[in-house]
Amino acid sequence: MIQVTLIQIDNYGPWTVTPGPRAEPDLQTLQSRLYGDLEREFGAHGAIVFFNRFDNLIAISNGMDYDDHLLIQQSIRNRYPITISMGVGTADTAYEAQKIATKMIQNGGGAQSANRCEVLNIDSLADDDNSLVQIAHIDINDITNTLTDIETAFDTSIKVYEVLLALMDELAKIGGMCFFIGGDNYMAPTNGISKDQLREALKVVDKKTGVTLKAGIGVAKQAGRAADLADIGLEDIRAELVDDSVLLFNDLDEY
């Protein structure tokens, strides 16, 4: 089971314009700092946070319980002018788990509700016996020579985000999610998706976007370790140690 935590800034839209519109550089700084702090605090528990939309962040939080989440909420309250609410859900696939986590937050009130503050609603937690995280680290083949060094920076970004949208769409169809993590890199929680299914999804995106993708996959009890294994797999593909576009490393013998 994969455990997903949705993190949402409380009443953020109204706060940004109260008592008047706040300076945009200050808001961007707040969002980036908040993401960095959440990544560090969740990461201390072996989890990973994806910035998603910055005011709505998604964490793969296997191994974390109610108290772990509560302490992070309190830490943010003590250091920021805003508060955060969280919803937690588990499921066989990442897409289904985030649906449950979203419902948990929505049950506590709307995103712009002045009455919602530090909601922490947990549908279920993945225990050690059934905790499993599968993460794919995906990148574009030779982006330096095909895009970065020959196209403008903005045109390269258009292509990178075109690939992201195609990956999000294809992986969601089979129960996965996908997030941009910088450069030409994407990270995808892919519980329940086989190597063959992922390989086929990458081929579909290749055809749609005109790039060539490859992916390392990691399987472990927690997201941090799964991502590390995925990184190793991707590095082996880059080094041409294997003749495949997808390589999986697994910490769990029973998987």
UniProtKB/Swiss-Prot annotation:
Recorded catalytic activity of this chain's protein: GTP + 3 H2O = 2-amino-5-formylamino-6-(5-phospho-D-ribosylamino)pyrimidin-4(3H)-one + 2 phosphate + 2 H(+)
Enzyme class: hydrolase
The EC number(s) this enzyme carries: 3.5.4.29
Record-level GO BP terms: biosynthetic process
Keyword GTP-binding: yes
Record InterPro entries: GTP_CycHdrlase_3, Nucleotide_cyclase, Rev_trsase/Diguanyl_cyclase
A Pfam family this chain is assigned to: GCH_III
Molecular function terms from GO: GTP binding; GTP cyclohydrolase IIa activity
Keyword Calcium assigned: no
Alphabetical UniProt keywords: GTP-binding, Hydrolase, Nucleotide-binding
UniProt record similarity statement: Belongs to the archaeal-type GTP cyclohydrolase family.
Task performed by this protein: Catalyzes the formation of 2-amino-5-formylamino-6-ribofuranosylamino-4(3H)-pyrimidinone ribonucleotide monophosphate and inorganic phosphate from GTP. Also has an independent pyrophosphate phosphohydrolase activity.
Descriptive protein name: GTP cyclohydrolase III
Organism name: Methanosphaera stadtmanae (strain ATCC 43021 / DSM 3091 / JCM 11832 / MCB-3)
Taxonomic path: Archaea, Methanobacteriati, Methanobacteriota, Methanomada group, Methanobacteria
